[in-house]
Amino acid sequence: MTKHVAVLMGGWSAEREISLRSGKACADALERIGFRVTRINVDRDVAAALVAAKPDVALNLLHGRPGEDGTIQGLLEMAGVPYVGAGVLASAVSLDKEYMKLIFTAHGLPIAPYVVVRDRDWQPGPGAGPAAAAAERKRVFDAIAELGFPVFVKPARGGSSIGTSKAHNQAALIESIEAARRYDPKVIVERAVAGAEIECAVLEGLDGAPPDTSLPGQLVIEGGEEFYDFEAKYLDPSGSMQIPAPVPAAVIDEVRRLAAAAFDAVSCQGFARVDFFYTADGTILVNEINTIPGLTATSYFPKMWEATGLPLPQLLDRMIATALRKRPGSH
């Protein structure tokens, strides 16, 4: 019997356009291999759309909130619709970089030093008074100074590098924090790591087996960007990925081990992409986990799996089959 897949895409986050591109690429691929597909351009009436569609399984490709923070996952759980990917808890903690880092640290995974700047740290309420507000701002600057410049400044709960920038001094830091706060009142400031950016794709293991990992890829940026920002990811034709990453075999093995460990640390399911830094002295640092990586025609998640021997149609078929085998509530 032909399975019916609801592909959820769009939404209202800053990553809407990327989600639509991922949704189209996957819906087209699923139709080519025989699935019946309903494309749902998600708005506030998504619950009604799901009820009307009556799918066998949902493929959630919403980037950012509400698709990656556990909200849509909770809706699907309540509706009794099996779905591909991480559950409510794993989605919520993985999207919030503060809690993601706390979990990684608790599991012994290596990460770069960072500082969390909360709304009340940066902009205390009117009752605080000018002196208290200035003291709180100084505390933030002192904590960041211990990281040392340059630093990366990111919205705590965002993706596709939207709102992320690099600051080389305090004046630029203020601008970067204000820019990140336009997307999230909580901001993460990380010590900039000089090194290669490496990514590894992960799939939930079959029938309870450990996670499977792809050959890692190394990002190659030739357009002059200081880091792999939104433009480099989606708009710059000079950006590319070398698969497998041009690093020693032992590093490939360790990246794959750490990717699986990060996947398990947040209790992820389905699929994810784990990003790393690899420095000249051989240090490997986990940067973050993305529980709904891009699946556009040019995205690196499917490219890494294709290089590992699993093209997009077969990749999606496996992801759907894994979701359909889950017991209700097993997320």
Give, region by region, the residue ranges found by the protein language model.
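ATP-binding N-terminal substructure of ATP-dependent carboxylate-amine bond-forming enzymes
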Residues: M1-A106, R118-R139, T322-H331
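Active-site nucleotide/adenylate-binding loops and adjacent lid/helix of ATP-dependent enzymes
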Residues: M1-M9, A52, V93-A196, L206-D207
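A short small-residue
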Residues: T2-L8, L235-P244, Y300
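ATP-dependent carboxylate activation and anion-phosphoryl transfer catalytic cores
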Residues: K3, T105-G108, P248-H331
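Hydrophobic beta-strand scaffold residues
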Residues: V37, P82-Y83, I111, V151, ...
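A short glycine-rich, hydrophobically flanked beta-strand micro-motif that places a catalytic Asp/Glu
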Residues: R39-D43, V187, R191, I198-E199, ...
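Phosphate-binding site of ATP-dependent enzymes
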Residues: H168-R257, T283-L285
